[in-house]
């Protein structure tokens, strides 16, 4: 009887020990951001949205005039004489070329977890929706019909194999994103210098 009690106590102790170890192993890293720890404040949304500003093109140097009539190059441009060929792969349709759109949809799937001032939340949502529209405009300009995605896709998502949506469908969604941005973004004098504002969205929509 005494031996059975000892075995029972030992079993309980082991169970408790393994349970404690499991709790320790389930901790999130303290020196980096993790998804369950991130979506907690309006500032988190602003931080995420600010990451999209790198999509915008930088200042153009004098080389931007190479294909204009501003000056003549010493060597003829290859595209003038049709010396360039169309690639059989790549060219803006690879996995990485859709990364920004997925990042936008990743945000859209999570931002509602945050509680706070609705106008500030909508401001960050407006920035993200502007950049989703930005990405899709250039996809349509390059390829014509493209698949419209507004959900976060995984490696095994069936939507990865969907066909292209028509330009009309895609531009309907683009305009919805831009209209949301126009409605919820501030005027230039109401935000920090360099931040997205409603007039930039209006200009892009036009």
Give the location of each predicted region.
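Bacterial Sec-dependent N-terminal signal peptides
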Residues: 1-29
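Short linear capping/connector segments at secondary-structure termini
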Residues: 31-34, 81-86, 151-158
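TPR/Sel1-like alpha-solenoid repeat signature
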Residues: 129, 202-205
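Aromatic-lined, polymer-binding surfaces characteristic
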Residues: 145, 192-203
